[in-house]
């Protein structure tokens, strides 16, 4: 599973980039917010990989909160990567959390591909979606990356935070420590 990529931007469009990673050029789907945030030729993106029968798709994000938002909406029945990316292009994670908290169906219906029925389902299923302030602070650091890696392995966020409390070190050290502690929980 690919969780991150670093390389040189060969081509940039509003909804995708071509990223040269050691001579191999990948097409990575991005939100408009991520596309606008790319200012340098060399970038590091957090990746969600979606493997289907007919395609192997990469979705890239500059911000871990945006990646978390994308991954969360993908878990909702009837919401695919296209709609997930449209949500990420329409809202920042903070704005999306406010829309969900206020149960604002009309705001959610502004997203291309979301009608009243889908908007209601999203609001019901994401009632507890919050942008974690602590995760936002450490999202670019080792702790945020370790939490993201452990979540991608299927562990619950509460258990991960419990396991990583009091731990320090680089990302790989934190992931190893987290796995050891999570096996005991």
UniProtKB/Swiss-Prot annotation:
<keyword id="KW-0963">Cytoplasm</keyword>
<dbReference type="InterPro" id="IPR003583">
    <property type="entry name" value="Hlx-hairpin-Hlx_DNA-bd_motif"/>
</dbReference>
<comment type="similarity">
    <text>Belongs to the RuvA family.</text>
</comment>
<dbReference type="GO" id="GO:0006281">
    <property type="term" value="P:DNA repair"/>
</dbReference>
<dbReference type="GO" id="GO:0005524">
    <property type="term" value="F:ATP binding"/>
</dbReference>
<comment type="function">
    <text>The RuvA-RuvB-RuvC complex processes Holliday junction (HJ) DNA during genetic recombination and DNA repair, while the RuvA-RuvB complex plays an important role in the rescue of blocked DNA replication forks via replication fork reversal (RFR). RuvA specifically binds to HJ cruciform DNA, conferring on it an open structure. The RuvB hexamer acts as an ATP-dependent pump, pulling dsDNA into and through the RuvAB complex. HJ branch migration allows RuvC to scan DNA until it finds its consensus sequence, where it cleaves and resolves the cruciform DNA.</text>
</comment>
<keyword id="KW-0227">DNA damage</keyword>
<dbReference type="GO" id="GO:0006310">
    <property type="term" value="P:DNA recombination"/>
</dbReference>
<feature type="region of interest" description="Domain II">
    <location>
        <begin position="63"/>
        <end position="139"/>
    </location>
</feature>
<dbReference type="GO" id="GO:0000400">
    <property type="term" value="F:four-way junction DNA binding"/>
</dbReference>
<dbReference type="Pfam" id="PF14520">
    <property type="entry name" value="HHH_5"/>
</dbReference>
<dbReference type="GO" id="GO:0005737">
    <property type="term" value="C:cytoplasm"/>
</dbReference>
<feature type="region of interest" description="Flexible linker">
    <location>
        <position position="139"/>
    </location>
</feature>
<dbReference type="Pfam" id="PF07499">
    <property type="entry name" value="RuvA_C"/>
</dbReference>
<dbReference type="InterPro" id="IPR036267">
    <property type="entry name" value="RuvA_C_sf"/>
</dbReference>
<feature type="region of interest" description="Domain I">
    <location>
        <begin position="1"/>
        <end position="62"/>
    </location>
</feature>
<dbReference type="InterPro" id="IPR013849">
    <property type="entry name" value="DNA_helicase_Holl-junc_RuvA_I"/>
</dbReference>
<dbReference type="GO" id="GO:0009378">
    <property type="term" value="F:four-way junction helicase activity"/>
</dbReference>
<comment type="subunit">
    <text>Homotetramer. Forms an RuvA(8)-RuvB(12)-Holliday junction (HJ) complex. HJ DNA is sandwiched between 2 RuvA tetramers; dsDNA enters through RuvA and exits via RuvB. An RuvB hexamer assembles on each DNA strand where it exits the tetramer. Each RuvB hexamer is contacted by two RuvA subunits (via domain III) on 2 adjacent RuvB subunits; this complex drives branch migration. In the full resolvosome a probable DNA-RuvA(4)-RuvB(12)-RuvC(2) complex forms which resolves the HJ.</text>
</comment>
<dbReference type="GO" id="GO:0009379">
    <property type="term" value="C:Holliday junction helicase complex"/>
</dbReference>
<dbReference type="InterPro" id="IPR010994">
    <property type="entry name" value="RuvA_2-like"/>
</dbReference>
<dbReference type="GO" id="GO:0048476">
    <property type="term" value="C:Holliday junction resolvase complex"/>
</dbReference>
<dbReference type="InterPro" id="IPR011114">
    <property type="entry name" value="RuvA_C"/>
</dbReference>
<dbReference type="InterPro" id="IPR012340">
    <property type="entry name" value="NA-bd_OB-fold"/>
</dbReference>
<keyword id="KW-0238">DNA-binding</keyword>
<keyword id="KW-0233">DNA recombination</keyword>
<protein>
    <recommendedName>
        <fullName>Holliday junction branch migration complex subunit RuvA</fullName>
    </recommendedName>
</protein>
<dbReference type="Pfam" id="PF01330">
    <property type="entry name" value="RuvA_N"/>
</dbReference>
<feature type="region of interest" description="Domain III">
    <location>
        <begin position="139"/>
        <end position="185"/>
    </location>
</feature>
<keyword id="KW-0234">DNA repair</keyword>
<dbReference type="InterPro" id="IPR000085">
    <property type="entry name" value="RuvA"/>
</dbReference>
């Amino acid at each position: 599973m690919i969780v991150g990529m670093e390389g040189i931007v060969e081509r940039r469009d509003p909804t995708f980039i071509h990223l040269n990673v050691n001579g191999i050029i990948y097409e990575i789907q991005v939100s408009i917010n991520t596309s606008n945030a790319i200012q340098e030729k060399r970038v590091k993106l957090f990746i969600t990989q979606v493997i289907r029968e007919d395609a192997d798709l990469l979705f890239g994000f500059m911000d871990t909160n945006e990646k978390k938002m994308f991954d969360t909406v993908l878990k909702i029945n009837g919401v695919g990567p296209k709609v997930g990316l449209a949500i990420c292009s329409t809202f920042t994670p903070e704005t999306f959390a406010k829309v969900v908290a206020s149960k604002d169906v009309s705001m959610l219906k502004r997203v291309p591909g979301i009608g009243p029925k889908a908007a209601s389902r999203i609001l019901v299923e994401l009632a507890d979606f919050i942008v974690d302030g602590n995760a936002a602070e450490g999202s670019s650091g080792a702790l945020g990356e370790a939490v993201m890696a452990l979540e991608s392995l299927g562990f619950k966020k509460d258990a991960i935070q419990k396991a990583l409390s009091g731990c320090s070190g680089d990302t790989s050290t934190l992931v190893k420590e987290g796995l050891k502690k999570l096996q005991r929980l």
